[in-house]
């Protein structure tokens, strides 16, 4: 058995070895190549786009369609773009209701290119293609984004083109033909004059989320296949000081661009803790400009100097939890006031504390709370009743977890026929849809407890899924689940016997609150990591699943044998049983 009782250092990223790094002054002086070091795949794609001849005139970038991402991409593209020697664009002259065309002689000409890279997160037709205006007989031509970026790169959000398909068709034709044709925006009203077409040399970067890219691929399968593709990597795996240093410099780079103070040495551990909670992995840090902007701006409100101190960062994080915590506190009150029945002491047969993550639409913070799973067993035909499924409150993944759990039990008991019991499993006081398999280990423990008629320790909660061989598999929401059960236990009074059982594979996903970490260090609360369901059962029931002496498996088999004998006896009509009884004397 490999039951591991976690220590304080297991519950969050271990940053002790990086304290000297956090004090380095050069963190606030990021290298010019920092973005390329953090986004090597994306920068390689940009180089392919900007090289002459380019691999393609179109590039697809998977990234959030937010202005911050488009602005960053445009800025980095601008640093890579080498302005060509010739001036791109033309000069249109309007005389006597006639429009003539001449090559641009300088940047001040009306349709000369004005920037190597132009960005827009939303465009209308006139903004993109320009327009022809006529007032009191005078005709004027207004350039659009395609004219401003002529000879360079235009960065657009995919959703603006998906919402206006005709806009995209016209833009694609212009880029492909390398010619801009003046067309009326209103088919019923032609242009007042004939305007000569102008040469166009333009490269397009389209930025979109996965759904937008899928819609674009369906609309333009051939172009999507030929376009250069890359992604904005929104996380960074760090395993050494160099990688962590690059991330810290990225944070400082964002702070300087926003004219905000950067973190002081004692603020870095808190910021990294929050970052690993956001990514859900102790060795993964976020590269989201939206995320880091939020942290820096909120922390700066509590900062009085040129740097964000650890105290300011801690105050900001605590205030945020308090500000967003009303709903979680009300749900906890339901348990503490015994409106939702959750036991955190004592023993019960067929009842166990599972852990759930609650997410409400429109609420920014998910939170965890314990859920009581109960199992009742009686003589029957071997049916496993999933009450959630019967009531149409259980999803397909939950149903799959139930079937896997049953398969494990039938295999372990080595039965030649169906169980002589019927078991009923349910989430008590659950009135909304339940899905996912993260409670399948808890359900299996409750079922085994009910079959063996052995009580479960209610001081311990459990989360994790199991496969058909009883191996424990990782699940999500570990921070919220652990903290949710800990809060209930803390409010009722910590006994030193309470804790949570989690999958061993989930240990790397922990980034728990300082309060919970301190309770673990003081032996007031425990978290155990396991690899197999048979490791959880002794902690919950004080009995081994299998082995020497009295075991859960043996107890269940004995109860099955007794039930089978009773079933065989009651199979005969009562007169035959009476005759059989008299003849035996």
Which stretches of residues belong to each language-model region?
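A short helix-to-beta-strand connector/capping loop
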Residues: 200, 225, 521-525
